UniProtKB/Swiss-Prot annotation:
CDD domains the record matches: EcFpg-like_N
InterPro entries to which the protein is assigned, alphabetical: DNA_glyclase/AP_lyase_DNA-bd, DNA_glyclase_Znf_dom_DNA_BS, Formamido-pyr_DNA_Glyclase, FPG_cat, MutM-like_N-ter, Ribosomal_uS13-like_H2TH, Znf_DNA_glyclase/AP_lyase, Znf_FPG/IleRS
Protein name: Formamidopyrimidine-DNA glycosylase
Classification of source organism: Bacteria, Pseudomonadati, Pseudomonadota, Betaproteobacteria, Neisseriales
One Pfam family here: H2TH
Gene: mutM
Naturally occurring in which organism (per UniProt): Neisseria meningitidis serogroup B (strain ATCC BAA-335 / MC58)
Cofactor remark: Binds 1 zinc ion per subunit.
Role, per record: Involved in base excision repair of DNA damaged by oxidation or by mutagenic agents. Acts as a DNA glycosylase that recognizes and removes damaged bases. Has a preference for oxidized purines, such as 7,8-dihydro-8-oxoguanine (8-oxoG). Has AP (apurinic/apyrimidinic) lyase activity and introduces nicks in the DNA strand. Cleaves the DNA backbone by beta-delta elimination to generate a single-strand break at the site of the removed base with both 3'- and 5'-phosphates.
Reactions listed under catalytic activity: Hydrolysis of DNA containing ring-opened 7-methylguanine residues, releasing 2,6-diamino-4-hydroxy-5-(N-methyl)formamidopyrimidine; 2'-deoxyribonucleotide-(2'-deoxyribose 5'-phosphate)-2'-deoxyribonucleotide-DNA = a 3'-end 2'-deoxyribonucleotide-(2,3-dehydro-2,3-deoxyribose 5'-phosphate)-DNA + a 5'-end 5'-phospho-2'-deoxyribonucleoside-DNA + H(+)
Protein family (similarity comment): Belongs to the FPG family.
Source species, domain of life: Bacteria
Amino acid sequence: MPELPEVETTLRGIAPHIEGKTVEAVVLRQLKLRWQINPDLGEILSGRQVLSCGRRAKYLLIRFQTGVLLIHLGMSGSLRIFTPSDGRIGRPDRHDHVDIVFSDGTVMRYRDPRKFGAILWYEGIEEHHPLLEKLGPEPLSEAFCADYLYARLKAQKRAVKLALMDNAVVVGVGNIYANESLFRAGISPHRPANRLKKKECALLVETVKAVLQRAIETGGSTLRDFVDSDGKSGYFQQEYTVYGRHNQPCPRCGGLVVKETLGQRGTFYCPNCQK
C-alpha cells in the first residue's frame, strides 16, 4: 500500500506538470473504486484551472477555484504524467481507470489494479471534508513533537505500534514506516503506549521524521505496484532494517528479526534491541 512517502513522492512528481493548467477533458473508464467516481466529473472539471496541489495524510489534493479533487491511491494506485514532449501517450490498459487531460496536451493517468483507491470531488471547505477533519498532525510538521506525542500516549494502554499507526494520533505512519521507526528508536512494538517516557517519545518523533524524510528522498518503497509519476520505482526498500526481514540477522546485534501479527498487520522487530 502506498504510504506517506509514496504519496509525497507522487505529489512532487505531478505538481510541476499540472499546477496552473486548465482541464480540457476527463476520460472515465472505470467508476467503481472504493467509492464510486462522480460520473459527471468531466463536466465538473472541464474548463477549470488547477490552482495548487497538496497532500493531507495519504490524500492528494488538487485544488480548483471552487472545489478540491481528493485522490487516494488505495492499495495499488499510482498517478502517471504524460506530456506532449513524451511523444505518443501510452495506450491505457485495463487497470488505467481515469485520464485527466489538460489543454496543453498533458495527461494525468490514474492506475489502480485492485481498485481500492478513490477520486472524490468536494466543494466545501477542504479541512471540513469527513475524511480529513479528524486527522492528527502531519509527522513532518512542528506540531508532531515530543510534548504532543507524550500527551497523546499517556492515556493509551494499547501497543505503541498501533497508536503510531492511528491517523487520529499522527497521519501517514503506515506499517512499513512504523516498523522501521520503532526499530531505530529501540522501542518494542508491543510496549504499552502509556509506558513510554518523555525522552523515548522525543526519540520516536525524531526517528519517525528521519525515516519518512529518507523514504521521500529515495522515492518511497516499491514492493508491488507503486511507481512515481514518471513510472519509476522507489528504492527505500533497499534500506529496510527489519521490515520484511523475518529470520534474517538484525543489522545492529546480529540476532534474528522476528515477525508477529499485531493489529492484523505483519510486525517485524528485534527482541534484543527493542524493549
